[in-house]
């Protein structure tokens, strides 16, 4: 079964491909099919994931999986939230987004540094699927003051798992997959579509 992954993010593709090993599913990234990314006009992770999945399903004629994820920091009123990938501007990269996050927290003092990664995954069998499978995962930790680690992407270097005392960027792939918001969401999604991707 071929499924199009509605993302241009190579890190997300690598994580999903790794976690889908053993299932009868070939995951192809939208870019490999010449599909562009739609405008993310939703106000929630769920809305944006549906927009992305529907866009890819329409253009590819294939089932589509989309993920919308981000980091919510209570001390910042839930920011960066749905704007996590473009927190420092629409063309900003991971380093600039991390720099802005740390600056915003620094301005507010050293109080509450909790943060929660959220991931919503959506599976559409076709563009007009009236009953999409929707899964959510979350991972709560602490935002550290100095980036650590070289794995992962996004805010991983500043997101510390409280039980392990390591940032997401310090974890190897199996450890991260077992704990992460994306790992949780994908496992829940697979349960919801198990009959369709069973190996």
From Swiss-Prot:
One of its GO terms (biological process) is purine nucleoside triphosphate catabolic process. InterPro entries: dITP/XTP_pyrophosphatase, ITPase-like_fam, RdgB/HAM1. Keywords: Hydrolase, Magnesium, Metal-binding, Nucleotide metabolism, Nucleotide-binding. This is dITP/XTP pyrophosphatase. One of its GO terms (cellular component) is cytosol. Its EC number is 3.6.1.66. It is an enzyme of class 3 (hydrolase).
């Amino acid at each position: 079964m071929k499924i199009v992954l509605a993302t241009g993010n190579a890190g997300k593709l690598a994580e999903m491909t790794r976690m889908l090993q053993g299932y009868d599913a070939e995951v192809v990234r939208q870019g490999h099919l010449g599909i562009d990314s739609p405008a993310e006009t939703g106000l929630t992770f769920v809305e944006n994931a549906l927009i992305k999945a529907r866009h890819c399903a329409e253009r590819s004629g294939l089932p589509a999986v989309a993920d919308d994820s981000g980091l919510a920091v209570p001390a910042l009123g839930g920011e960066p939230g749905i704007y996590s990938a473009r927190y420092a501007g629409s063309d900003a990269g991971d380093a600039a987004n991390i720099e802005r996050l740390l600056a915003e927290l620094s301005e507010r003092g050293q109080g509450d540094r909790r943060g929660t990664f959220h991931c919503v995954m959506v599976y559409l069998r076709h563009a007009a699927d009236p009953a999409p499978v929707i899964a959510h995962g979350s991972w709560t930790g602490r935002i550290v003051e100095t980036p650590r680690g070289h794995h992962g992407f996004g805010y991983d270097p500043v997101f510390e798992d409280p039980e392990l005392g390591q940032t997401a960027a310090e974890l190897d792939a199996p450890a991260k997959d077992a704990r992460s918001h994306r790992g949780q969401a994908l496992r829940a999604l697979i349960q919801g579509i198990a009959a369709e991707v069973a190996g």
